[in-house]
């Protein structure tokens, strides 16, 4: 891993629209279903189990939405160097009416980090994301060990406004953490052949009988996926968003 942790300004009190992730012991383990592996790309083996003592931190209750990202643009006038595919679903610099509360997509890691820095936050590490989604008991989904289509966006074939599935929270009440859109982490790798970041959670889109798309649908919280970083415009797509974390004093 060549890029993981960038400290944010720290606070004591839970910030607005974030939840407290208390300190605790956590067994970090990742697993990919061998049936979902792309035969053309050698995915790295992250199957080691590591016991970690997690510090207290804060995480966004929901993925960053279109309206939140619009506020960032209004206040900063941020424009990426490469605008290919940037906010592709928007028109004239704004999200379409009725989509304000959808997770923002068609942003790449640099776009997400720019937002996070403006907000006084940062992207989560893989370990932070999984601990916030899973807690300390190694459950497979935020709510337990069995998939439940009433608790997340399960094959609806479109993204949904954040907060729609209020019964699908994690042990710490982090919402929309599986399904809807993939979420970026700060973990970036270079294995000598590929430069990639790790995304988590799955998305609403579930391709059938195709090896050219990553596995879709809501996925277990211990499932990592590799997002190849090829070029800024190509690193943006319709099913990857992000949420932020903030350090605690």
Locate the predicted segments by residue.
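Periodic aromatic/glycine/histidine/acidic cluster detector
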Residues: 9, 231-232
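Functional-site microenvironments in short loops/helix caps that host divalent-cation chemistry
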Residues: 21, 27, 87-226, 233-238
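Acidic glycine-/aspartate-rich tracts in secreted/extracellular proteins
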Residues: 64, 77, 136, 187-190, ...
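A short glycine-rich, aromatic-capped structural motif
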Residues: 10-87, 107-110, 179
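Short, structured beta-strand segments at or near domain termini in extracellular proteins/domains
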Residues: 238-249
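Intrinsically disordered, low-complexity PEST-like regions enriched in Ser/Thr and acidic residues
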Residues: 4-5
